[in-house]
Amino acid sequence: MLEKLMEEGMNIARLNFSHGTYEYHSKTIQNLRLAIHNYSKKIGYMYPLAIALDTKGPEIRTGVLDGGLTEVELIMGNTVTLTIDPKYAENVTAQMIYVDYPNIVNVMKKGDRVYVDDGLMSLLVQNTTHSTLECTIENGGKLGSHKGINLPGVPVDLPAVSEKDKSDLVFGVEQNVDMVFASFIRNGDALREIRDILGEQGKHILVISKIECQQGLKNLDEIIDASDGIMAARGDMGIEIPVHKVFVAQKIIFSHCTKAGKPSICATQMLESMTYKPRPTRAEVTDVGNAVLDGADCVMLSGESAKGAYPLECVRTMANTCLEAEAAIWQRQLFDDLRYNTPCPVDPSHSIAIAAVEASLKSRAVAIIVITTSGRSAHLISRYKPRCPILAVTRRPVVARQLNLWRSVIPIQYIMPPAQDWMKDMDARVQFAITYGKGMGFIKPGSALIAVSGWKEGAGCTNTLRVLYASPHEIY
């Protein structure tokens, strides 16, 4: 199944650490790497699938259902008790629900609302004691284990990084994950704490901040500056702020990321109906397409592929919709706007990135080939949203995997050892990208190409741009 998902277009695998044990996640990572190995052998080149660790974050969640049940029903109008007593942590019933936030009994008062499971169920607080909240069920539903709880408008004093998060981050470093999706980020200080925990051994790991609360939106620019990327996590966001404002918040997040040159991810309920049905609603397909038009670099599936009955169909539908949406963007106007708003002066690599996109538009190039070590040149070119794919050739596996976050970038891991003649080695890597593009079908003999690289060995920056034309035969 994992190999089939990669074939359909999956390029980042997200592990949700709100659920599962370390043994479970370790086994999943082993399975992913085995699938990557097998799929790479099948297609004849290294498939750079990235692995992301999604932290639980400073969330509030319910306990485990009693007796191994998968769900219990909360009936509208009934009374239910929320308790902080640990003895109910694994004995949750429809009448008594454990909550893992001890201070909830102090911050809540009569008349406040508690939202459960992304707002599917709502409870109205009637009375508080030193260890419980007596509530009336306003909107019922089926409750499972470890479901999220939101307290909109109520200031909570949760730590930026919980003890579980710290342990999970250390586990992620040991497992050599490529990126961390940090939940419920409220300010830039949380990012600095996460990087301290990752330490020297995990300094290569990208930290993507999930914006899902009012404080996160208020401090958006501060968080963008401190992050490697941003995720618009619309599930909790739609509870923390009025649901009719979520689409505006999404557009603000993506536009700020585009301006800052940071990758952005759109997540939550994108193809929710496909969890149980083989075809999406028209509104869901429109949502995916509009996320791309809004400027998102990535779109993400969660429950649809994690527990759904049609994971392959979900990935296929999402990939096809993204292709259609990308073709509908007015690339020239977008590029001109982005270039106009770039402050001057910029460094040589940045100048070359702008020139490469301009040259690709003027020459009608079918691809921009970037020879990169750190991936920064590909990031910069992606920032200006070219009309053609960016083939980023690198020898570093972690760079290839992480480049999946950036829009238009197709990472290619080059595994051949360096040639003694640096210029021949450079040309061989460019030819490798051309051969890849021919195999994918978007490079034809005679196609115009833009090649971006350094001008000599050890240059340390990208400062050379060439316009090439694909040969009908392979040179190397």
PLM regions and their residue ranges:
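Non-catalytic helical/linker scaffolds that mediate oligomerization, partner binding
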Residues: 1-476
